[in-house]
Amino acid sequence: MRGLSQRVKSMKPSATVAVNARALELRRKGVDLVALTAGEPDFDTPEHVKEAGRRALAQGKTKYAPPAGIPELREAVAEKFRRENGLEVTPEETIVTVGGKQALFNLFQAILDPGDEVIVLAPYWVSYPEMVRFAGGVPVEVPTLPEEGFVPDPERVRRAITPRTKALVVNSPNNPTGVVYPEEVLRALAEMALQHDFYLVSDEIYEHLIYEGAHFSPGTLAPEHTITVNGAAKAFAMTGWRIGYACGPKAVIKAMADVSSQSTTSPDTIAQWATLEALTNREASMAFIAMAREAYRKRRDLLLEGLSRIGLEAVRPSGAFYVLMDTSPFAPNEVEAAERLLMAGVAVVPGTEFAAFGHVRLSYATGEENLKKALERFAQALQ
């Protein structure tokens, strides 16, 4: 056997997927474990969305779809971006993908040449730098600091810009910090994209899960430089349906669709019709989002209050469903801390692959009883 490519051998598997798989395997073996690892809603997909999927099946809507998505969904996506985000886009400036992850993967394949630099704000979602490297680019990390609330410092970002800078990735609300970036910070970053002529990649997958503050889409300021990425997974509890969507300059969107045409062909057709229902039946969908958001807010408050009560520190998140917890009371580093907590019966994600050193990520996309049990075990692990 000749072996694998250097490109694939250099790529790291997703740390979050691996940790969650390990937790699930331990539970299958009967281990009493509270898993705070999953980056997905614990709610079921709303019934009106599932019914739309069943209807598509009954109507025989099971054939190939165009690489950029069915026209009806692209129109609904464009309308969503116009109505909710203030982005004046046409259906031709949108694409439907196999999850938001494929939108990002296709984008980097479409815009990066070998050696192009992409600024990534740390802590970051683990897949950003790997996708950049896979496309031949160079990820350039710019730290955000816990003492600054993990909010980006625009001047620190500015100092990282070079003639090779091709893009800057922003993710607000943020995974793994849960921080919602202030509008003035996003405005400053958009102005840099205009001034230095690079792409602004705005990952807004958690936009509907904000508990304090408001969401702002920087693409309103730099539409010709911004690719806005979103999807059905987090808002509508549709992680397994694998539908993402994005909007941006027509030439970039066309190139992303070309990548799809030579890889996945198109997203699942049935899932696209279900997502169309999620986007167009606003009354039912917004009621579901409001219910889920309130549940997450209560869980966040329960978790933060519990951590504070037992002397553990975390930057207060304003969105998403994650908390980054300081691990110094448990161990010298986040990996040892995660192992100690696993032995105590709680699975968490070490911050290493997020570039969140000295922290672990806790997901509160789980029931309140699980969170209470996890807090009890944290307290026991400190003794």
UniProtKB/Swiss-Prot annotation:
Q: Which GO terms describe its molecular function?
A: aspartate-prephenate aminotransferase activity; L-aspartate:2-oxoglutarate aminotransferase activity; pyridoxal phosphate binding
- Does the keyword Cytoplasm belong to this entry? yes
Catalysed reactions, semicolon-separated = L-aspartate + 2-oxoglutarate = oxaloacetate + L-glutamate; L-arogenate + oxaloacetate = prephenate + L-aspartate
Q: Name one Pfam family in it.
A: Aminotran_1_2
| A GO CC term attached to the entry | cytoplasm
**Keyword Iron assigned:** no
Q: Which cofactor does it need?
A: pyridoxal 5'-phosphate
EC numbers on record: 2.6.1.1, 2.6.1.78
Q: What is its main location?
A: cytoplasm
Biological process terms in GO annotation: amino acid metabolic process; biosynthetic process
Q: Where is this site: Important for prephenate aminotransferase activity?
A: 12
| Binding, L-aspartate | 39, 125, 175, 361
Q: Which UniProt keywords apply?
A: Aminotransferase, Cytoplasm, Pyridoxal phosphate, Transferase
* Signal sequence residues: none
Give residues where N6-(pyridoxal phosphate)lysine occurs: 234
Q: Where in the cell is it found?
A: Cytoplasm
The record's family statement is: Belongs to the class-I pyridoxal-phosphate-dependent aminotransferase family.
Per UniProt, subunit arrangement is: Homodimer.
Q: What does this protein do?
A: Catalyzes the reversible conversion of aspartate and 2-oxoglutarate to glutamate and oxaloacetate. Can also transaminate prephenate in the presence of aspartate.
Name the chain's protein: Probable aspartate/prephenate aminotransferase
Q: What is the lineage of its organism?
A: Bacteria, Thermotogati, Deinococcota, Deinococci, Thermales
